[in-house]
Amino acid sequence: MITRRQSTEIRLGNLTIGGSAPISVQSMTKTDTRNIPATIAQIKELEECGCEIIRLAIPDMEAASALKSIRPKVKIPIVADIHFDYRLALASLSAGVDGLRLNPGNIGDPERVKAVVKSAKEREIPIRIGVNAGSLPKDLPPELTIAQKMVKAAMGHIKILEGLDFGLIKVSLKAFDVPTTIEAYTQIASLIPYPLHVGITETGTPKTGLVRSAVGIGNLLYMGIGDTIRVSLTAPPQEEVFAAYEILKSLNLRQRGPILVSCPTCSRTEVDIVGIASRVQEALNKIDKPIRVAVMGCAVNGPGESKEADLGIACGKGQGLLFRKGEKIAVVPEDELVDALLREIASL
């Protein structure tokens, strides 16, 4: 049983973050924010696959202005990602964003920081302090580890906001190195009450990035650390959302859509179990029912090994078994197994 760290609650648009609220799934658009139709279309696609928070890069005033057209067209909270220029933060707030990702120490002039905080406070808009290992301040003590530097940098940004009586704060500390990221989060989790956004940065393409993210995010979540998560991949953002839910489901922290259980195959397998499992997974991706489905490679061990599945098939040469909760309900010709399984799923 995972005991979650108790953080303060904040509101991000229509979403509660922290406290006892469910761990939220976030992604980031990969369109040019200035391309309004493309950005709206991508956000709507992400909404359909379960994304709950979307972050948009705001590189210039044209992108900030685009938010005024984007915000009314989408349902999920929008976070504007701001670097250095406080005017972009002010313009994004005026455009109606639900949150900012901003490091106040990078803005420079304290009066500019005050202007951003004043505007955010008036609108009750939270600010996420996002520290990345690759862009740490140069004046940090050299004897500190990277994780310690990340925490020190984050605490510096936090103190600026707290000094302006601003408490709608969320924090992230990301690195490519998984142990460094885990160390940074575990340190800061005991120092602050604010919600934590968890992720591993720049993990790469899905083949490697999914593994790094699952190990890093999964370890932190198992320790109870994390209120929102993002799986950062060099891939379409829908894949990030799918992966995030799989991590949450694997730890029994969230349940969205089906879980596919399939065997790794062995010499007893007499059918194309890889192809069958892939076909079933493709069909399950379009289903929201929180069920467990099994695809097993032999009729000898299949039903017993997947007895916790709501439905499943055990495939044999020429025919296979269709079963529910480990109990056989039908013998089905091999070429009809997948269709029979999908019909049973639809009837649930």
Swiss-Prot record:
Its cofactor is [4Fe-4S] cluster. Binds 1 [4Fe-4S] cluster. GO terms for biological process: isopentenyl diphosphate biosynthetic process, methylerythritol 4-phosphate pathway; terpenoid biosynthetic process. Pathway: Isoprenoid biosynthesis; isopentenyl diphosphate biosynthesis via DXP pathway; isopentenyl diphosphate from 1-deoxy-D-xylulose 5-phosphate: step 5/6. [4Fe-4S] cluster binds at C263, C266, C298, E305. InterPro entries: Dihydropteroate_synth-like_sf, IspG_bac, IspG_bac-typ, NO2/SO3_Rdtase_4Fe4S_sf, RibuloseP-bd_barrel. It is an enzyme of class 1 (oxidoreductase). Converts 2C-methyl-D-erythritol 2,4-cyclodiphosphate (ME-2,4cPP) into 1-hydroxy-2-methyl-2-(E)-butenyl 4-diphosphate. This is 4-hydroxy-3-methylbut-2-en-1-yl diphosphate synthase (flavodoxin). It comes from Dehalococcoides mccartyi (strain CBDB1).
